[in-house]
């Protein structure tokens, strides 16, 4: 790989220092980006069960910092920037998942990397960087809060008796963690009192996700069914919402998502999961990463879905007559 794709990690610390000097003050939007994957590395470092892997995880942390600074230092835009970002993503994932975890990790780390979210959190953080004016046009002037969120699913009123109707409302809000969302925090107040007296007012907030995506390293039939259920619940609470799944390795037969509320499943590596007997082989894992990198073409399909969604007017009942239909 080229230097841009994180090939030479022996000089990561020196390169990090140089890049600190080169990168000027970040735009406000960039400073809001959550270090989702970094948090998982730090949590693993603090995990007593991973004490054999402390040095390895510290190497991963240095590589992470280099990866993020490399993304932020890109001066390209549009398709070229997505291609550059995908190349950097492949470089970092190859180093983390093959050169570090698969090659040097303890049995605990190899078995529990999914549970520790050391692998799929990379993709979660990568997606946040796609929601940027250098890639997407017509973004609004406010923060779309991209990233993992606990997203609103449904709301119901549940008064326990007739006398309770004049008291603080009893409200049941259902929500669910999503790996990636685009949306907005909504603040609410419910009260039988028009002056919103504090004793009879229920207030709170929820995250309204208008676009959500699930990130999976491996994807089987059970996961597909779970995603279908989540998509249906998400759209029950927000009918205009979009729901996607981004998968690295497929572990099932492809199905017609039109039979569900899932808008699409993107196969990032265009690859199936390794057979069970090959998953512990370093050579097989390394070869799979080499032969099946994450494809810019597939990432762009997801970016185009976001762009089309941004450009579309989601609901315009005033135009029903001229359109000739309700929607």
Features from the language model and the residues they span:
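Short His-Asn-centered micro-motif
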Residues: 213-218, 245-249
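C-terminal tail/extension regions appended to the core domain(s) of diverse proteins
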Residues: 1-121, 133-147, 151-159, 163-165, ...
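Active-site metal-binding core of divalent-cation-utilizing nuclease and nuclease-like domains
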Residues: 147-203
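Conserved catalytic cores of phosphodiester-cleaving nucleases, focusing on short active-site segments
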Residues: 180, 209-217, 227
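Short, catalytically relevant binding-site loops at active-site mouths
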Residues: 187, 219-220, 250-253
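Active-site-adjacent loop/helix micro-motif of nuclease/hydrolase catalytic cores
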Residues: 189-194, 218-229, 236
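Short amphipathic alpha-helical segments
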Residues: 119-127, 223
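Glycine-rich, often proline-containing surface loops adjacent to acidic residues and nearby aromatics
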Residues: 105-110, 206-214
